[in-house]
Amino acid sequence: MNWRSEHIWIELITGSRKTSNFCWACILFLGSLGFLVVGTSSYLGRNLISVFPSQQIIFFPQGIVMSFYGIAGLFISSYLWCTISWNVGSGYDRFDRKEGIVCIFRWGFPGINRRIFLRFLMRDIQSIRMQVKEGLYPRRVLYMEIRGQGAIPLTRTDENFTPREIEQKAAELAYFLRVPIEGKRN
């Protein structure tokens, strides 16, 4: 959801609470749990699940490797579930022409820098820059060039914008901020 008026533009940023992250976290959790159960059943010599008889999987080396993969997968899936619950990467971009201030807010990982809040004056914005990388994995990112601070990304690298969408977004934002557009192709 985005909100725009004559003087204020607020753009909400989706964080890690995306459908694909939920799917990957579930698949990884269930798969690693399966590996761990098979490794444990080969260690105990009993069938904890009826799909594989425990005699077919020897604990050394197959059971150890499956247990290791199961434990590693559980750690990775717990990392994904934590980023989903903390909603890492979500936030908003607020452009206020009336007060001449730009605010960028993102949620990070817990700790000192959990809240990432950037604030600068609109007169310090030099340009809006599009970085376009074509090829097998195309990448189109929108940056805001700030005097003395460099380029700050406004879009995520995993957002799949078409060339027309990224150009339209850059043009609208540049028009709203009254700054030029720069393009860069790789």
Swiss-Prot record:
The chain crosses the membrane at residues 22-42, 57-77. Pfam families: Ycf4. The keyword Chloroplast applies. Disulfide bonds: none annotated. InterPro entries: PSI_Ycf4_assembly (IPR003359). One of its GO terms (biological process) is photosynthesis. It is a multi-pass membrane protein. It is found in: Plastid, Chloroplast thylakoid membrane. The keyword Methyltransferase does not apply. Its main location: plastid. GO terms for cellular component: chloroplast thylakoid membrane; photosystem I. Keywords: Chloroplast, Membrane, Photosynthesis, Plastid, Thylakoid, Transmembrane, Transmembrane helix. It comes from the Eukaryota. Belongs to the Ycf4 family. Seems to be required for the assembly of the photosystem I complex. This is Photosystem I assembly protein Ycf4. It comes from Dioscorea elephantipes (Elephant's foot yam). The lineage of its organism: Eukaryota, Viridiplantae, Streptophyta, Embryophyta, Tracheophyta.
